[in-house]
């Protein structure tokens, strides 16, 4: 189970931060109920997302940042693909309960079927990448703050097994369209992986081959 969990978590950490969250300028959201209602409305209207991403990973043991870039794809209801292009080719695809990784031209497919922890982690990843908190399920504590330009959602797993892999996550949503601008995942209090998304496209057709997990 641990091996599968590590592979699934690599959807967020595969090759290698955006700088660790600096919450200066953020305060409690004025009306959290209204925010959640609007977020639900916005995310429910999205059927697919394509974006460019820059990932930066920091591990305190190495005291350095490793940077990578690629393309992100998401399609309703539960298909995700991270296609890393630099500095090394790497691809991870999650579709339903199947996970496929391609590294150095070699593909590996595993099944997470019937594993509750895998379901929970997969839901968490989908929620964080898309901003759809309703996809997250139970077992997570959330804190919502805002600045002039964006919303900040901090997610803290309450399940200790999940916390062994994810200490907390921060999602930065653009106030203009409620899309994810930045995502920071903390493995612990010092090590983290961050993503910045750009060139976002919504509700455009994505070739089925992108999510092929055969």
Where are these regions (language model features)?
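Positively charged n-region of N-terminal signal peptides that target proteins for export
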Residues: 1-4
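Bacterial N-terminal signal peptides
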Residues: 7-16
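Boundary at the C-terminal end of the N-terminal hydrophobic targeting segment
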Residues: 18-21
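Structural recognition of beta-strand segments within beta-rich domains
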Residues: 62-66, 71-76, 80-86, 91-94, ...
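Flexible, processing/modification-adjacent segments and terminal tails
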Residues: 23-28, 40-45, 52, 57-58, ...
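Gly/Pro-enriched, hydrophobic low-complexity segments
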Residues: 110, 133-214
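N-terminal secretory signal peptides
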Residues: 32-58, 71-73, 81, 89-91
């Amino acid at each position: 189970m641990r091996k599968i969990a590590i592979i699934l978590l690599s959807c967020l950490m595969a090759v290698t931060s955006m700088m660790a969250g600096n919450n200066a300028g953020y305060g409690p959201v004025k009306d959290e109920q209204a925010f959640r209602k609007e977020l639900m409305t916005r995310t429910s209207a999205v059927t697919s997302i394509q974006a460019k991403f820059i990932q930066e990973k920091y591990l305190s043991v190495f005291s350095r940042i490793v940077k990578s870039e690629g393309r992100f794809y998401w399609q309703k209801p539960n298909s995700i693909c991270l296609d890393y292009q630099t500095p090394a080719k790497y691809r991870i695809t999650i579709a339903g309960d199947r996970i496929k990784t391609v590294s150095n031209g070699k593909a590996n497919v595993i099944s997470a079927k019937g594993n509750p922890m895998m379901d929970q982690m997969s839901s968490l990843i989908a929620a964080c990448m898309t901003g759809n908190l309703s996809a997250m399920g139970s077992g997570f504590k959330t804190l919502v703050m805002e600045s002039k330009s964006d919303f900040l959602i901090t997610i803290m797993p309450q399940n200790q097994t999940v916390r062994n892999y994810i200490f907390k996550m921060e999602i930065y949503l653009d106030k203009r369209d409620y899309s994810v601008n930045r995502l920071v995942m903390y493995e612990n209090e010092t090590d983290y992986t961050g993503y910045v998304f750009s060139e976002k496209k919504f509700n455009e057709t994505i070739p089925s081959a992108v999510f092929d997990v055969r």
